Amino acid sequence: PPPRGAAGAFPGRRCFIRINMEKPTDTAIRPLHETELPAASALAGRVFAEFEAPEYSPEGIGAFLRFAAPETLAAQHRNGSMQSWGAFRQGTLIGIITLTRRSHLCLLFVEKACHRQGIARALFSALRDHCRTAPDTPRITVNSSPYAVEAYRRLGFRATGGERTVDGIRFTPMEYLFI
């Protein structure tokens, strides 16, 4: 009789196909070093330009680029007001997530070629696990761009208000509650 399990047989033939149903585990998530912040800034800028900037005013684009500039990120990391994690594949940075104010997610970007591969979820999982260890942190907040609202919903966030615009940046305030 033909073997059973992950291998399948074509009726009447002794031909088998082995299917690997597991997702590759070649992505490493770890805290970013200050020397990696320029690459993180560049990644955020590329992804923002393609997916979010078309919906923003010039004022909003400028505000984002100033916030995500390498020198701004480095200054905030140095003074302890920001922490960032990166997703790496074969040593290449493919995604970033950033935390401010102990529980506010402010940057989550994944290279276009790596979308829908669980990278954002893995980055959020690292950030969430970090926040769970902090005292008096009942939730994680985010100001989601219009493009990312549905992705944040899939991660377990819920909107806490309607869309707003501040300094040209369009966003929906959302939160993730630790239950």
Report the location of each language-model feature.
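Conserved acetyl-CoA-binding loop-helix of GNAT-fold acetyltransferases
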Residues: 116-129, 154
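Conserved GNAT acetyl-CoA-binding A-motif
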Residues: 131-144
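Conserved active-site alpha-helix within GNAT-family acetyltransferase domains
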Residues: 121, 146-162, 166-170
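Acetyl-CoA-dependent GNAT
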Residues: 31-34, 42-112, 124-126, 130, ...
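Conserved N-terminal entry element of GNAT/NAT acetyltransferase domains
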Residues: 13-38
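Terminal substrate-recognition subdomain of acyl/acetyltransferases
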Residues: 20-22, 133-134, 147, 165, ...
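Short coil/loop residues immediately preceding or within conserved phosphate-binding loops
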Residues: 82, 139, 169-171
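Residue-identity detector for glycine
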Residues: 5-8, 12
